[in-house]
Regions:
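Feature primarily recognizes SF3-like P-loop helicase cores of small DNA viruses
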Residues: 1-32, 58-439
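Short, small/acidic-rich helices and loops at N termini and domain boundaries
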Residues: 1-2, 35-64
Length: 439
């Protein structure tokens, strides 16, 4: 044992508080929202911290050393606690410094950050040819800027864009290779997850705290029973109520972006609101050529270009910021969203059908009569009818689009005043006999 005795160990007594003061005087460390943060970002694994504390203590503290290390870590949480540690959105912390949105770069790690990417900034990095060729083979040219902007969007802890992305294909195109490359770019700041789990498990959101990106590599095809958790993540622009199993809920920063690869659409079982679909950027892949021979090493080749991919994504981020966080969206992508929306809500097709109803400014029809006609249209077209309440809600939500007006002052066949819509005329009417119709 050396002759030097630290201030936190005097006369055989170990002072945990003084130890933490000594430790924090030589280490940049803070504790907030249930996690330690350093100049390297969030401390994902506390074991290196415990090991360093152990090495400092082992020469002076003998019995129950492991337990005392645990106690020190707990005291360190109190000593390093800060009231708030909000995300900073005008810069990207990288392995060799900080890249600001205006393009300036500062070397070194002078400050504690929430997230630091494991990639070096090299303004002279070569163009990522494998990556660009892969995207060119996978996606339509007009959709590549959207991917560029979305990946760039994920570099900063901000949800201002209020969009998630779904890349949809038939299978075998290689779209999931994007996730492998992003894992190299984001490191521990990205998580593999499940959109379905997020939608149905109230604890799943807390698992995405401090995370920049969540990738669902193979999104489930089942429609989501509830969408509020997913929508809240996509649009969060501040602290959110988070809950971990067996613990009291708390307010935490949420800025994780959602990216899903799928062979189908992201649908909702009950939510047919425009907001659910408006938050999705839906891209479709090209058909895989029958003659194409897949390169089994393509993911590794692209990952080796990660410094060039960073520059490419940063260019997309700068364009997105310049456009006020409005994503570049091709007509194909817009059409994809409209098709998904219509597929989940056949009320649109009913309103645009012929022979059942007619849009007419001076006409009016009761909600009940419209729903009965809608059910007949569904039956004759082998479609599933939504419930009456959902049907009325869909009409109300889109009444401006079809020049309708919701009212509770329509006279039915019995002369009673009921709910209905002005601007639509029934061309068929239900008879009193069930399942019987007359024109």
């Amino acid at each position: 044992m050396s002759n030097f005795t630290p201030a936190w160990f005097k006369k055989g007594f170990f002072n945990e508080s003084l130890f933490c003061d000594d430790f924090l005087s030589t280490h940049q460390l803070l504790y907030s929202n249930g996690a330690f943060f350093t100049p390297d970002g969030r401390m994902v694994d506390p074991m290196p911290l415990r090991c360093e504390i152990f090495e400092m203590m082992r020469e002076y503290v003998g019995a129950n050393l492991a337990k005392k290390v645990t106690n020190v870590v707990d005291v360190l949480k109190l000593a390093a606690q800060v009231e708030d540690f909000p995300p900073v959105t005008d810069r990207i912390a990288l392995a060799n410094g900080t890249l600001y949105l205006d393009g300036t770069f500062q070397e070194g790690k002078p400050e504690i950050v929430r997230n630091r990417l494991p990639v070096k900034y090299d303004p002279k990095a070569t163009q990522p040819t494998h990556w660009l060729r892969f995207l060119s083979d996978l996606l339509y040219p007009e959709d590549i800027p959207t991917v560029q902007e979305f990946i760039g969007y994920c570099l900063i802890p901000s949800n201002k864009g209020q969009r998630m992305m779904v890349i949809k294909g038939s299978g075998g195109e290689g779209k999931s290779q994007i996730g492998v490359v992003l894992s190299r770019l984001f490191g521990c700041n990205m998580k593999d997850g499940s959109i379905g789990k997020i939608s149905e498990n109230r604890f799943a959101r807390a698992d995405l705290e401090h995370t920049l990106l969540c990738v669902d590599d193979d999104m489930r095809m089942e429609a989501l029973r509830q969408t509020n958790y997913v929508k809240s993540i996509v649009t969060a622009q501040g602290q959110m109520d988070l809950e971990r199993k067996g613990k009291q809920s708390y307010q935490g920063w949420m800025y994780a972006r959602l990216l899903a690869f799928s062979n189908g659409d992201l649908q909702a079982l009950y939510d047919r609101s425009d907001g659910f679909y408006r938050r999705q950027l839906i891209l479709t892949t090209k058909d895989k050529p029958l003659s194409r021979v897949d390169d089994p090493d393509i993911a590794e080749k692209m990952a080796a270009e990660v410094e060039g991919i960073l520059l490419w994504a940063f260019e997309g981020l700068q364009r997105l910021v310049k456009n006020g966080f409005q994503f570049t969206e091709s007509e194909r992508a817009k059409c994809n969203r409209e098709l998904v929306k219509r597929d989940n809500n056949n009320v649109f097709d009913f309103l645009e059908s012929e022979g059942y109803i007619r849009l007419k400014a001076d006409a009016c029809t009761s909600s009940k009569e419209l729903y009965e006609i809608y059910k007949m249209w569904c039956e004759e077209n082998s479609l599933n009818a939504i419930k009456a309440r959902g049907f009325s809600d869909a009409l109300i939500a889109n009444q401006r689009r079809y020049n309708l007006e919701s009212t509770n002052n329509i006279a039915n066949s019995s002369g009673r005043r009921v709910r209905g819509f002005v601007g639509i005329e029934a061309l068929v009417q239900p008879d009193l006999t069930p399942n019987s119709w007359r024109v």
